[in-house]
């Protein structure tokens, strides 16, 4: 199953490799309108994460999780309200409970327990060169994370 954020206040799913798309019905459960980042949990395809915000670039942002492929949603507990829409979400295949989320304005959040609790990196984009893309070996400078194919390591 594929998931994609294609419009304001909705994400879509496809069961035929993208030939057709159906709305997941996020709009009836999530109050912040602009859906942006979508991520399926690496070890459990039932669990979907959604990053969104009030608009494409500004306002309040939020993170949500669905345990049932988008039928129901919960807002995740961030340590502070993001300074903009959550655009990027990433996980690590070796540790699917490790997630990164970044706002359009540079804040980076991390969880090691699949989203039950989050911390905010002290440094933001501009100081962190690579934050939410895992494709083999990556590293962040001046704080952030470093990983290869093993479980991720955080540096502050």
Residue ranges, per PLM feature:
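Extracellular glycan-interacting surfaces
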Residues: 1-156
């Amino acid at each position: 199953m594929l998931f994609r954020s294609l419009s304001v206040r909705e994400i879509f799913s496809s069961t035929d490799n993208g030939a057709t798309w159906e709305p997941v019905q996020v709009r009836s459960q999530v109050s912040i309108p602009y859906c942006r980042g979508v991520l399926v949990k690496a070890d459990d395809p039932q669990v979907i994460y959604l990053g969104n915000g009030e608009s494409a670039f500004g306002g309040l942002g939020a993170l949500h999780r669905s345990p049932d492929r988008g039928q129901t949603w919960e807002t995740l507990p961030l340590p502070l309200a993001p300074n903009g829409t959550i655009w990027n979400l990433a996980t690590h295949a070796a540790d699917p409970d490790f997630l990164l989320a970044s706002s359009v304005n540079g804040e980076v959040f991390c969880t090691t327990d699949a989203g039950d609790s989050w911390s905010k990196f002290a440094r933001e984009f501009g100081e962190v060169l690579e934050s939410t893309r895992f494709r083999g070996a990556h590293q962040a400078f001046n704080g952030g994370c470093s990983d290869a194919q093993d479980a991720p390591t955080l540096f502050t």
